[in-house]
Design a protein with these regions (language model features):
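Active-site neighborhoods and metal-handling regions in enzymes and metal-associated proteins
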Residues: 1-259
Length: 259
């Protein structure tokens, strides 16, 4: 409706789901229930052919629970850390790792992971709850240049990591002025990942699966914006879309008011 009202077309099939832990869940036949989080990943194609790619997550009832709020603010902090590094000459892998470190701090604070956040990231423990890369190039394709494979997305001499999570990073080049990238960290509780002994076994000394079980049914949160790399500070092209806890609750709450 919003896209059509602007005379535009969708840049890709939108993801609208209460099962945010399923990363590309296009099924939309669920009934919204009190206490759930709704994740919307969508974007429009501009009249010049360029794509946008934005994600917001909000509480169906208009109010984050304490646990939802803590996780949401951790994802937002991770996004802020990553966005701040979107500057010329910065390696995109380092942008990703900055987001990972912020999320790892949350995991340690919540008792999901023991030890230091730095060790958690080095060993890939954070990826059990953030199993994808922090973003990708954005252009006339949503995942720009991806059809050309790693020879376009990775700088010469750089190869994909074999570590779970980091290996899904779509881009590993040094950022340049004029680049537009997405920054989209998330926090997900994925039963299949936490039940995979091949992933959790090597981390059993720092991973608290009993604590993780207490988060069962949480589903997922993702926050995504489109960032223009300039000669100076990063420019958030989608900053007008509310994303702070206060703004999200106010906007959703207002939409729920009768009349």
């Amino acid at each position: 409706g919003v896209i059509a009202a602007g005379g535009l077309v969708p840049a890709y099939t939108s993801i609208v789901t209460v099962r945010g832990e399923i990363l590309h869940n296009h099924g939309r036949d669920n009934l919204l229930e009190d206490g759930q989080l709704l994740l919307l990943d969508g974007g429009a194609e501009s009249i010049t052919g360029y794509a946008t790619d934005v994600t917001r997550t909000w509480p169906v009832n208009g109010q984050f629970s304490p646990r939802q709020k803590a996780a949401y603010e951790a994802v937002l902090a991770a996004q802020h850390a990553a966005i701040d590094l979107c500057r010329p000459g910065v390696r995109y892998r380092d942008v990703h790792l900055a987001a990972c470190l912020e999320l790892a701090r949350f995991l340690v604070d919540e008792g999901l992971v023991r030890g230091s956040p730095e060790d958690a990231v080095a060993r890939g423990a954070h990826a059990l709850f953030f199993p994808h890369g922090v973003g990708h190039l954005l252009g006339m394709d949503v995942h720009d240049l991806e059809n050309f494979g790693d020879q376009a997305a990775y700088a010469p001499g750089r190869e994909r990591s074999t570590q779970f999570g980091l290996g899904y990073l779509r881009l590993d080049r040094d950022l340049e002025p004029g680049n537009v990238v997405t920054i989209e960290p998330g926090f997900y509780v994925v039963p299949a990942i936490l039940a995979d002994e091949g992933l959790t076994g090597p981390l059993r000394d720092i991973l608290d699966l009993d604590r993780a079980a207490e988060w069962s049914g949480f589903c997922g949160i993702r926050i995504e914006d489109d960032i223009h790399v300039t000669e100076g500070d990063p420019e958030n092209l989608t900053a007008a879309i509310p994303k702070t806890v206060a703004d999200v609750e106010a906007r959703v709450g207002a939409a729920m008011m009768p009349g």
